[in-house]
C-alpha cells in the first residue's frame, strides 16, 4: 500500500501556440503517478477573445504511458468536464467535455492537442513550465 504513490511528481506547462494572438491556450498542473499510469489535476483554458470560452477551469484525470516514438518518451491523455454557460439571449448551462492528448519527452516538451465545446486544437506545442524544466533536468 505504501508503494501506491511511488515516484509521484508535479508537472506544469502549456498546450497551444503561446504568443499567437487569440489562440486558445491550455495551462496544466498535474500530479503524475507513473507506477499507476495515472494523471490528475487541473487545466485552465484561456483565450484573449472575450466570451464564455475565454477562461475555463477543468478538473481532469488521465493516463500516462511510456512510448517508443523517437524523441517522444511518454504519451498522455486527459479528460474532464466543466460547466459551460450559454450566452444571451439563450439561458442555461450544461456540462461540456474536455479532452487532451500529447506526446512528450522526459522534460514534458512535445506536441499535442485538446478539444472543448465546439473547439478543436491540434498539432500544437506542449511546453513545460520554465521552473519545471530545471527541476526535471
Where would I find each of the regions flagged by the language model?
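Short, solvent-exposed loop/hinge segments that bridge or flank secondary-structure elements
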Residues: 2-36, 54
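Short, cysteine-centered beta-strand-loop-beta hairpins and adjacent loop/turn segments enriched
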Residues: 18-22, 47-54, 85-89
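Amphipathic hydrophobic-ligand
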Residues: 22-26, 53-61, 92-96
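A short, structured loop/turn motif at beta-sheet edges
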Residues: 31-38, 65-72, 104-106
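N-terminal glycine/threonine-rich, aromatic-flanked beta-hairpin/loop signature
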Residues: 32-57
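Short, solvent-exposed aromatic-acidic interface loops
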Residues: 43-49, 79-85, 115-121
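Edge beta-strand at a domain terminus
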Residues: 53-65, 109-137
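Mid-chain, well-packed structural core segment of small domains
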Residues: 61-101
